[in-house]
Each structure stands twice: as structure tokens, then as C-alpha cells.
UniProtKB/Swiss-Prot annotation:
Keywords: Aminoacyl-tRNA synthetase, ATP-binding, Cytoplasm, Ligase, Nucleotide-binding, Protein biosynthesis
GO cellular component, one term: cytoplasm
Domain of life: Archaea
This protein's name: Tyrosine--tRNA ligase
Keyword Ion transport: no
Single GO molecular function: tyrosine-tRNA ligase activity
Gene3D superfamilies per the UniProt record, alphabetical: HUPs, Tyrosyl-Transfer RNA Synthetase
Name of the encoding gene: tyrS
Subunit-level organization: Homodimer.
Species assigned in the record: Saccharolobus islandicus (strain L.S.2.15 / Lassen #1)
Binding-site list for L-tyrosine: 36, 162, 166, 169, 184
Motif ('KMSKS' region): 236-240
Family: Belongs to the class-I aminoacyl-tRNA synthetase family. TyrS type 4 subfamily.
């Protein structure tokens, strides 16, 4: 695979690369690059996470040595699953199982547990050094990476450790690339700034889009005056808002019901969850999407790329109901092997029930 091909694969469907020039230089160096994503085991896996899962798959295929950090302690600090570490660890196992059955070759991933990292005194020394090189105001601004607002830091002082831990994860693992959703931008920018002060390697940040919740843009009125990345974090699909999300363990019928009830105004692309599912989840997996229609309405039509489909939708050539039916059909095809895998393992069924009762913000 050429450098241009690797670059195209790595950047496909990314919301932001900081910076593209630095990424190209790293690829041109011909050194084996190391990347990572850290995930909080915080509940059921919804389809929004498939966006970064696909990007992990892309990075592995592009020859990047990827680390998957099971951020158990981070989830504990963030009060996920009621702060129950045993349940958090179960959720981590479940998440890795989903990633595997999505099609990521987990044998090519370096899977790291935060539980192991925090046992090392060098790790905590690094956390302190990072904190010493960041202002308190900057740390508090970065709390949005946890789904928290700056003022919420007063609730529990441990929250202030979180951003320094995330930056330390990056330095401790000696990474070239940090992958995350756009809600992780503040942490990655903090890592880049602190790297200069500490003489550490400056990461390239790859930010994937946050999938808007099924309610779409209907909640935009509450986001006035917020920064763009914070707006996207506010309206994203969230496991703590089950009505806004499709979970990978949902039945075929539930997926169809949720898709058919989702926000999808005729001719509108902005904050349209159905179009986003097609763009970020379905088209990266399939070469085409078929819209089945009665012959009275033009008959079946196929689209080989997302841009062509979006244009047709904006121009009113595709009805929302037809779009939703096609989306539900393709999405269920993607989710079927994941569902079957989870059904084959009773421990995951029991865990899903426990997690469903324990999901916190």
C-alpha cells in the first residue's frame, strides 16, 4: 500500500486530523507507527461507537500498530456504572467482543488494561509531571472529554485527575497517533501542548465524528452559545439516553422500529441521523446501497457512494420512509454477526442485563 493509499484510508470519514502534514511526514518516515484509542467501559455498545471501531480497522489495515486501552480506572473516576469496578471490567470484555465481531482483527491489537498501568509508579510520576505543566483552568476546560462541564469538577476532586491521566496514557504508551471522537479534542490538544513543554513526542490526533442521536437536530435550541465540539457532544447518540440510541444487541425488530421513528425530515441533511448512519457506518462497509421502491415511485435505485445519495435526498428524489427502510436493512446486516456472538455467550447476556440497570451518565 502506497503512502497516498494509507493516508486516504486513515483519513477517510475523519472529522479532523491534527495535522495532516504531520501525519504524512510520519508515514513517509517509514517507521512503524504506534496509535491508540482509549475507551471507557461505561455501558452498552451503541452504533455511534462503530465509527471509531471502523477507524481502528482502517488504521490496522494501513499498517499502524494499534493499542486498545481498556480505560477502566477512567470509567471509575467518571462514576460510570455506579463506580462498580467489577461491572466496568465486564463491560470492557463485552466491548472487545463487539469490536472483534465487527470485523477488527483483535490479534493485531495491543490490548492494554488501565488496571495494569496504574500499578506502575512511573505512570503516576508521569501524571504529576503532566499536571505540573498544565494550568488548573486548562484542566477544568478539558473536563468535557468526560461528558462533564467545567463547573462539575467541584463535585468530586478526582475528576481533575482524569485529563492528566489521559495525556499520560499517550506519553506512557509512546504513541504517534491518538484516535478519538471529536469530544476528545481538548485532551489531545492538551497532550500536544504539554508534549512541547516536557520534550515528549507530539501526537497526530485523528478525530472521528460523533453520531447524532436519533432525535437529530430537534434539541439544537439548548446548544446556543456552546463551542462546536461541545454542541456535537450534547446532541450525540448516548447510551445514557436509550431513546436516542441503537445498541448492537438490539433485535432486528428494535433496530427497524428505532430507525423508522428517527428524525429524518424530507430534503434535510444537517443533523440527520439516518444520513449519518449511511455515511459513517454503512458506506464504509458496502460498495452500494439499494433503495427499494414501488415502480409507481420510480422503482429501485442504487447508489455507489454517499455523496450521490445525499444529493438525491436533498433534491427530494428519495422519500424518508424509503431511505429508512434501506438503512435498517443494511444496518441489521452489519449487526447480525455481533448479535449472534453475544447470544452464544450466556455470560454476556447476563452482563447486558446488569449493565442496562446500571448505566449512568
Amino acid at each position: 500500500m502506497s503512502i497516498d493509499q494509507r493516508l486516504q484510508l486513515i483519513t477517510r470519514n475523519a472529522a479532523e486530523i491534527i495535522t495532516i502534514d504531520e501525519l504524512r511526514k510520519k508515514l513517509e518516515s517509514e517507521e512503524k507507527l504506534k496509535g491508540y484509542i482509549g475507551f471507557e467501559p461505561s455501558g452498552l455498545f451503541h452504533i455511534g461507537w462503530l465509527i471509531w471501531t471502523q477507524k481502528v480497522k482502517d488504521l490496522v489495515e494501513a499498517g499502524v500498530n494499534m493499542t486498545l486501552l481498556r480505560a477502566t480506572w477512567h470509567a471509575w473516576i467518571n462514576d460510570k456504572l455506579g463506580g462498580d469496578l467489577s461491572l466496568i471490567k465486564m463491560a470492557a470484555d463485552y466491548t472487545v467482543e463487539v469490536i472483534k465481531n465487527y470485523g477488527v482483527d483483535t490479534t493485531k491489537l495491543n490490548i492494554v488494561d488501565a488496571d495494569d498501568m496504574v500499578k506502575e509508579k512511573d505512570y503516576w510520576a508521569l501524571v504529576i509531571k503532566v499536571a505540573k505543566n498544565a494550568s488548573l483552568a486548562r484542566i477544568k476546560r478539558a473536563l468535557t472529554i468526560m461528558g462533564r462541564r467545567a463547573e462539575e469538577a467541584e463535585i468530586d476532586a478526582s475528576k481533575l485527575i482524569y485529563p492528566a491521566m489521559q495525556v499520560s496514557d499517550i506519553f506512557y504508551l509512546d504513541l504517534d497517533i491518538a484516535l478519538g471522537g471529536t469530544d476528545q479534542r481538548k485532551a489531545h490538544m492538551l497532550a500536544r501542548d504539554v508534549a512541547e513543554k516536557m520534550g515528549k513526542k507530539k501526537i497526530v490526533s485523528i478525530h472521528t465524528p460523533l453520531l447524532v442521536g436519533l432525535q437529530g437536530g430537534q434539541r439544537m435550541s439548548i446548544t446556543e452559545g456552546m463551542e462546536e465540539d461541545d454542541i456535537q457532544a450534547e446532541i450525540k447518540m448516548s447510551k445514557s439516553k436509550p431513546e436516542s440510541a441503537i445498541f448492537v444487541s438490539d433485535s432486528r425488530e428494535d433496530v427497524e422500529r428505532k430507525i423508522m421513528g428517527a428524525y429524518c425530515p424530507k430534503g434535510v441533511a444537517e443533523n440527520n441521523p439516518i444520513l449519518q448512519i449511511l455515511k459513517y457506518i454503512i458506506f464504509p462497509r458496502y460498495n452500494f446501497v439499494k433503495i427499494e421502491r414501488d415502480i409507481r415511485y420510480g422503482g429501485d435505485v442504487e447508489f455507489k457512494d454517499y455523496e450521490e445519495l445525499e444529493r438525491a435526498y436533498i433534491e427530494g428524489k428519495i422519500h424518508p420512509m424509503d431511505l429508512k427502510k434501506a438503512t435498517a436493512r443494511r444496518l441489521n446486516e452489519i449487526l447480525e454477526p455481533i448479535r449472534k456472538s453475544l447470544e452464544r455467550k450466556p455470560e454476556f447476556e447476563e452482563m447486558i442485563q446488569k449493565i442496562s440497570k446500571s448505566v449512568t451518565r
